[in-house]
């Protein structure tokens, strides 16, 4: 039975102590987590030749996780994605959230869950698992309700990373949680993923955005568009620079509506790093997966872990989540969490090898 290894990391700018938690399975693969942002710091899995590769982007020091705007590996909340102009109405009351991304509220605001140090619980009786908890007070970044949040990470001997989110609030509020890991299955230092990664998405439709990067409220078929990943294709083949949607976001930064999303657990996406042979399957209980092709990543070697430099399209994200800006689109499935009701969602990232 493998255990969780805990080491000190670095203090935040506020003097808060942080730690790294490494779950290593019996085959030598591992996942390392940080209590700042309940974040994924590394995922090390074997390639087709048996060599171990770290397949997520990350920072060398704590200040990258604390201040940079990429959200590498972070737990994002209370509400992931953009809320148009930071405004929504709940139970007849208008709310104005902090605007931290142009004219929008993004990923929970300036002091979102990704910027907070969570309490970590490691129990030897629960193998291969780290549980993070956070108390978010009423009014936190403008959201109503005292909220208790839990994120449980488990990494098993089959190289399956399971993330389970749960939350409860004493008032009606908005809740839409995700993990913002950036995957490069050829290794985090291997450069662009556009021409050496295949991606398949279990979605016949996606949600278009406007020039402000907010959902239009429509749900559009992917057929005959560059957003059609219903069969595996190179990620770069989906970035059609002549497509207005791609131009708005400088790449893919869109929600894909999953097929069979009324089922309890569905396949969201499959990917493969062609050079490494490492594969990734993503299953989720959520309605959709937001795919982001690292369109604005610019991390210099003095910040990237292992002195890595990360640029545009150096990774892709599979952010399983509820519909974006749902509070402002009544036709979208709601992201309202009712008082004293339980929010629970689960995602599995399954790593394998295509030899």
PLM features: residue spans?
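An exposed, glycine/acidic-rich loop-and-rim segment of catalytic or binding clefts
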Residues: 2-355
């Amino acid at each position: 039975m493998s255990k969780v290894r805990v080491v000190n990391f670095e203090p935040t700018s506020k003097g808060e102590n942080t730690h790294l938690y490494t779950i290593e399975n019996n085959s030598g693969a591992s996942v390392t987590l940080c209590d700042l942002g309940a974040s994924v710091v590394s995922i090390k899995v074997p390639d087709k030749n048996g060599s171990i590769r770290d397949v997520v982007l990350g920072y060398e020091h704590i200040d990258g996780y604390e201040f940079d705007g990429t959200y590498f590996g972070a737990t994002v909340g209370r509400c992931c994605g953009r809320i148009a102009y930071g405004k929504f109405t709940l139970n007849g009351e208008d709310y104005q959230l902090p605007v931290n991304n142009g004219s929008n509220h993004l990923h929970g605001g300036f002091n979102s869950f990704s910027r907070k140090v969570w309490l970590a619980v490691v129990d030897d009786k629960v193998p291969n698992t780290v549980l993070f908890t956070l108390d978010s007070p009423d009014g936190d970044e403008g959201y109503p309700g005292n909220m208790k949040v839990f994120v449980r990470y488990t990494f098993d001997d089959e190289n399956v990373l399971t993330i389970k989110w749960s939350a409860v609030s004493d008032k009606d509020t908005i809740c839409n949680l995700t993990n913002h890991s950036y995957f490069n299955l050829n290794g985090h230092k291997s450069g662009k993923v556009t021409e050496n990664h295949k991606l398949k998405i279990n979605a016949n439709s996606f949600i278009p955005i406007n020039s402000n990067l907010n959902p239009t409220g429509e749900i559009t078929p992917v057929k005959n568009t560059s957003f059609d990943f219903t069969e595996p294709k190179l990620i770069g083949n989906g970035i059609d620079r002549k497509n207005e949607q791609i131009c708005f976001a400088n790449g893919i930064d869109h929600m894909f509506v999953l097929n069979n999303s009324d089922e309890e657990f569905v396949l969201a996406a499959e990917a493969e790093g062609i050079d490494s042979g490492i594969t990734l399957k993503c299953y989720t209980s959520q309605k959709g997966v937001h795919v982001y092709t690292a369109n604005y990543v610019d991390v210099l070697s003095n910040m990237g872990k292992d002195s890595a430099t990360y640029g545009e399209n150096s990774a892709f994200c599979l952010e399983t989540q509820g519909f974006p800006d749902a509070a402002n689109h009544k036709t979208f499935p709601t992201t309202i969490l009712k008082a004293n009701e339980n929010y629970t969602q689960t995602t599995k990232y399954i790593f394998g090898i295509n030899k």
